[in-house]
């Protein structure tokens, strides 16, 4: 319980820092951060039904946590303490559509949210883990989404635009229904993700 609460505290501080320093050209991005800050400022109940589960890509988790920059050591240390308690998942909507290689090299975990380790009904906060040289095909969802790259270099695409390089500490915001794709280039990628808005509707492949 203590490790989960520390994670909640650290991401709360992290999102407050983004709110203070980012220039908001998108009002939904500002609203999203407000929702994250408000929700992680509250007392949250421990989910007694939360069960540990691993996926094949978890073979990269240790090195991905180790590669988190020192400036985010609070988050990486809390993840180190939580890593053996996490329920890693895959999106069932992708079954029989994405390749077997994708499912060997992608997974996400919800730490705060309706089904997270800490229960919160109106946001989802967790991790995305991608293996080496994996392509995550274009997909979209109604929820607002923010990715904060913790470790690894990757390429990200919005709509049909060119892929752009994203490095550790970069932030990527996806408005509702914006198609996006990503691919890794020789190293695993660990990212903090957050959802707000229509969080109970899963992502769908395009």
Q: Could you say what each language-model-derived stretch is?
A:
Residues 107-114, 123-141, 162-163, 175-177:
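Conserved short histidine dyad/triad with adjacent acidic residue
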Residues 8-121:
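A short, N-terminal "cap"/entry segment at the start of jelly-roll beta-barrel domains
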Residues 131-132, 141-160:
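Glycine- and acidic-residue-biased ligand/ion/polar-headgroup-sensing regions
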